[in-house]
Amino acid sequence: MFTKAAFSSLCASRHAPISVAVRGIANIPAHEYHIRFDQRVGRKRPAQDVLDRFKRLNNGMWIHAHPGRHKLRYMKDETWQKTSLYYETCTKEQCEILDKLMTPYWLRPKHYPNDPYSAYHVRHNIDSPRVDDRGNFVRERKKVLMDDSTSQRFFKDC
């Protein structure tokens, strides 16, 4: 039936190593690694993945849910189950990257009724100047004409 050469070539082709596709730059979809532009309108499009996974606060910080918070919860201890439901803040570099992926509409402050994040839009007890997306100084409360030590002693933002 089979000659020895035909049988050996058949076995050799069966045991040939399988080439596995590596996720290099050529295999990453184009929308994942660059800012997209709408061809009809001719302006930048917001990255939908960022809108789905992150929330931008009115002070310019981005927050996101704890990764893996719904995975194998029954195996985790109670402390992890409690803290995994918290939101995490992004670093300064991450916030800058996320701002570049968004359009100016999403960088403006948003005011929603019954916003669950309303307590987090104002940063408390931070002495550094607050700057909005245009570089303008932003105040959380009305300016009081007194020195900072007196205002910190008698006036609280809480």
Swiss-Prot record:
Its main location: mitochondrion. The gene is mrpl-35. GO terms for cellular component: mitochondrion; ribonucleoprotein complex; ribosome. Transmembrane segments: none annotated. Keywords: Mitochondrion, Ribonucleoprotein, Ribosomal protein, Transit peptide. Belongs to the bacterial ribosomal protein bL35 family. This is Large ribosomal subunit protein bL35m. It is found in: Mitochondrion.
